[in-house]
């Protein structure tokens, strides 16, 4: 059996990540959130989903893993710092930033399960 090329593995992982993000966005929308941005990139970092419900802004990191525990532990301290830095930049560009409260969430996407939303995860 021939091994997959690295490019093929990367593409599969990228596709799996995008599907997980869309599943997470659907989960959040059904909870009453409005998706403001997906894959928001800055020079400081990236936020998978920025969702808003009223004056609450949720900066969401999406992880597709085999288990909930694996997904939570996959969000490292470095990733948390990058997400916080990117969210500060996003907030500074909002006209009503003084009214907004920010929360950092994780949505764990596991096989054959509904995505699990973990509010205020870090």
UniProtKB/Swiss-Prot annotation:
Family, per the entry? Belongs to the UPF0102 family.
Q: Which Pfam families match?
A: UPF0102
Q: What is this protein called?
A: UPF0102 protein R00337
Say which species the protein is native to: Rhizobium meliloti (strain 1021) (Ensifer meliloti)
User: Gene3D superfamilies this protein is in?
Assistant: 3.40.1350.10
> What one GO molecular function would you report for this record?
nucleic acid binding
Cite the source lineage. Answer: Bacteria, Pseudomonadati, Pseudomonadota, Alphaproteobacteria, Hyphomicrobiales
